[in-house]
Regions:
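Iron-associated oxidoreductase/ferritin-like identity signal
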Residues: 1-174
Length: 174
């Protein structure tokens, strides 16, 4: 059984993951609208991944005897300046998620909830991977540049990343 404090923090993380899912969905839509099919495919995948992260938390709370709450999603931005802006904002979103997960893990240690702390270690590792992924994309954008055919080349590079990224496991596999 988890404490009410940890339950509340886990539900807050559900909110964070739900927001990230919709945020990436909005970014994907913007990319699609602006002819960036590769970036859109990548961001649709990120949206699905964040939803899976949310459901994993949801199921954990229920299994631990708590009440998982469906997230309320605040308004999602729909307009972005350019592809650089999209990926800078995506990195900031991942950094926010990392901070939230780390705070949650810290609270678990303070509460001596080692089971939930152990559960969260997957998220800690995942957040490291996600931040590195978005930094790599931004590094590629910086190298390629956005002048001339740069945006086209960026879209192709991000499409390759989307193609090579493993599909998130379904909830039955987790």
């Amino acid at each position: 059984m988890i404490s009410k404090k940890i339950e509340a923090l886990l539900n807050k993380q559900i909110q964070q993951e739900g927001y990230a899912s919709y945020y990436y969905l909005g970014m994907a839509s913007w990319c699609d609208f602006n002819g960036l099919e590769g970036c859109a495919k990548f961001l649709y995948g990120q949206s699905e991944e964040e939803r899976d992260h949310m459901l994993k938390l949801f199921n954990y709370i229920v299994e631990a005897g708590g009440q998982a709450l469906a997230p309320e999603i605040k308004k999602i931005p729909k307009d972005f300046k350019n592809v650089v802006n999209v990926f800078n904002l995506a990195l900031k979103q991942e950094q926010s998620n990392t901070k939230s997960i780390n705070n949650l893990a810290d609270a678990c240690l303070k509460e001596k909830d080692y089971s939930t702390f152990n559960f969260l270690q997957w998220y800690v590792a995942e957040q490291h991977e996600e931040e590195m992924l978005f930094k790599m994309i931004l590094d590629k954008i910086a190298i390629i540049g956005t002048e001339g055919q740069g945006v086209y080349l960026i879209d192709n590079e991000v499409a390759k990343i989307a193609q090579n990224k493993p599909t998130p496991p379904s909830q039955e596999q987790q």
